[in-house]
Amino acid sequence: MATIDTPVKTSVGGSGHAPVRAPRARRGRPGSRLWVKAVVALLLVVEVYPMIWMFLTSLKSNDDYLNNSTWSLPTTWEWSNYTEAWTTGNIGLYVQNSLLAVVPALALMLLLGTAAGFALQVMVWKGRSLTLLVFLAGMMVPPQMILLPLFTVYFQTGLSGTLWPLILTYTGTGLPLTVFMMATYYRSVPRELFEAATIDGAGILRAFWTISLPLVRNALLTVGLVQFFFIWNDLLIALTFTNNQDLRTIQVGLLNFTGDFGATQYGPLFAAICINVFGTLLIYLFLNQKVMKGLTSGALKG
């Protein structure tokens, strides 16, 4: 007759099987954890210290910067450097021009890229795979190769001397990456949602506006933020098409900042750099969590 073995309880000095202990989780050596913390601390210093130094330098007078140690604190805190950079250095105008070029280009890029990603991944039609390859091929074209032809086209069409060359060029150069990323995010959206909407009588436009856009809003925010940093930090395209001082973007303005003062004024110069750097950094810190959600949502298959 078959029997079932039962565990025998053991006592001190008793007989029977020794109790089996659950394996302990392997812990790293204290020395290795210390090295990891040291490396993280070093990377943090490398990233944060230049910003602290830049901010402190922006509060120094020109004599303080030239005559005292580079690592010293300001002898007098010159907060007026920010006012001087914003008004005399025209940083306020350059920020305005950057926003006037970036916001319309970003809106066009996201609208067209999202619609193209929806058409390439949700809608069924012949040639969509080839069309996606064409967009991917656009990512391989360096912007430097098309600047001269675009400059000729804009000059002949009378668009030179406006911000339209920047808006159109930013939209065209950023559209391939936007289409590719949005198509990747749409791939993770369950097809059953769109099939159910079609059965309920929803058309393509309604499915796009009311169903797809709410599902990919985190992806839209992520792609938009990535493209925003690319466009905001651009120097080459802006330098090519802004031949008027009143049309300079923030990066071109910083490049010519010394010329506007006639001589290098280090306090206002670093104040202008701080306005540019910390402004974009605050945007990222404010939207950090949504960006992380958007980065991971495209990797999950619904």
Region annotations inferred by a language model:
Residues 1-21:
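Short, intrinsically disordered terminal tails adjacent to the first/last structured region
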Residues 14-17, 29, 263:
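Intrinsically disordered, low-complexity regions
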Residues 33-302:
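A structural signal for multi-pass alpha-helical bundles of membrane permease subunits
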